Amino acid sequence: QIRKVGKSYRTFYMIEFAGINPETGAPQFYTNDLDENGNYIKEITEKYSEANAIVLDKHAEPNVIGGLSNTLRYKWFDLNFMFSYQFGGYSYDNWAQKTEHGGNDLEANIPTYYRDSWKQPGDITKYELFIESPDVAMNKSTTTRRLHSSDFIRLKTLTFGITLPQVWTQKIGVNNVRVYASANNLWTWAAYDYYDPEAVSGGSAIWGTPPLKTVTFG
């Protein structure tokens, strides 16, 4: 990340990923050299060392953060819910920088999405040839391939309750009885679903514990 006048706080600064070469299965990057007018030249290279990092129009801090809650009541019944959401931010998958090693080392288990890696000429995919070669492995490179939207909508709480009529409860010497069931983090939509957007810290996703789903009764 970088702090620069005119840019959002926690703006990302890194090399641009240019996809996988469909003929060789090797990762590609934009060189992003500057021309005489200060514009980026989008030439493609397979050598990470030939690519230049640039200031992106993507930042860790979301543009919108909010929530929505309400309580609905009908006779004995009540239903309370609360949604939380955020939009406009991005996060970098630091954990993938360890796992996306293409078979080059044994630092971590391989993600399941590597089933869709390049296998033969003509394959169009996001993931490189799976081979023990440091020239192909992506685990030591920081690129936009691992930069993901952190947009999400989450049902944070959902509570359903029943308040028994006093004509029933007073017969046993009790003025008020309410029974309820409550669930937390029951449902989540996320723009990128390989890690929890609320487990991100400072735009970095690594080893974060996601909010747990819980159900309580009372």
Predicted segments — roles?
Residues Q1-A60, E100:
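Conserved small-residue
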Residues V64, K75-F77, D151, G173-V177, ...:
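Outer-envelope beta-barrel architecture signal
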Residues K4-T11, P22-T24, Q86-R178, A183:
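Extracytoplasmic gating/loop element in the C-terminal half of outer-membrane beta-barrel translocons
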Residues Q1-A26, S117-Q120, T188-G218:
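C-terminal beta-signal and terminal closure region of outer-membrane beta-barrel proteins
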Residues I41-A51, L129-T144, Y195-S201:
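Flexible, solvent-exposed coil segments and beta strand-coil junctions
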Residues A53-L56, T143-L147, G202-W207:
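Extracellular loop and loop/strand-boundary signature of outer-membrane beta-barrel proteins
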Residues G67-S69, T157-G161, T216-G218:
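Membrane-embedded beta-strand positions in outer-membrane beta-barrel channels/transporters
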